[in-house]
Amino acid sequence: MTKQLTIALTKGRIEKDTVKLLERAGFDMSFMADKGRNLIFESPDKSFRFLLVKAPDVTTYVRHGVADIGVVGKDVLIEHPTGYLEMLDLNFGLCKFSVASTPDYNPSDHKRKRIATKYPTVARDFFNQKGEDVEIISIQGSVEIAPVIGLADAIVDIVETGNTLVANGLEVFEDICRISARMIVNKASLKNKPELLAFIKKMENLVGDREVAFK
């Protein structure tokens, strides 16, 4: 008997791109078209169940075996690095981690900098690799105002188009790393569900063609 696969993903852009990818793989995803306020969806043939959750919670659902598969940005995985297997770079949801600040910021200044961010692990690791001792200020909301009001010398944040930075008088000084959506899986599920391995191989063949993945 075929076992159902549960997939946890973030509502919004990643969800939409994941649905498109599954459609290209030949799966009927029409049941996801009219979601309303629902957060749990099951395919008509019962082969898939989808959970729409907040991005940081995707790893939690996969880690505890509630979901067999998770689709989430690499930014989340860097901050929550354990308890799952990272299987595939899905080649969508592309953006980057960058250091940004007001135009008078000097990245070569060796004074102890204050860095505001929602991603303390990313920021700390980046500056440690540069041999710089920095003070990390964790902020949960919009970080763009931190350099403007003097709370921090610079910020580490996700940059896609850069429009939000420009609108707040900031510019990018350093790029840290590329970010994209990744597929993660539960370790026990990979061992106990042959359907999961077959699904991963199917996705791997599809995302290997970047033109197909981005079309």
Curated annotation (Swiss-Prot):
SUPFAM superfamilies: Periplasmic binding protein-like II (SSF53850)
Regions that span the bilayer: none
GO CC terms, sorted: cytoplasm
Pathway info: Amino-acid biosynthesis; L-histidine biosynthesis; L-histidine from 5-phospho-alpha-D-ribose 1-diphosphate: step 1/9
Main EC class the enzyme belongs to: transferase
Compartments (UniProt record): Cytoplasm
GO BP terms: L-histidine biosynthetic process
Pfam short name (any one): HisG
Molecular function terms, GO-annotated: ATP binding; ATP phosphoribosyltransferase activity
The keyword Nucleotide-binding appears for this protein: yes
Entry note about domains: Lacks the C-terminal regulatory region which is replaced by HisZ.
HAMAP family: HisG_Short
Stated role: Catalyzes the condensation of ATP and 5-phosphoribose 1-diphosphate to form N'-(5'-phosphoribosyl)-ATP (PR-ATP). Has a crucial role in the pathway because the rate of histidine biosynthesis seems to be controlled primarily by regulation of HisG enzymatic activity.
Protein name (record): ATP phosphoribosyltransferase
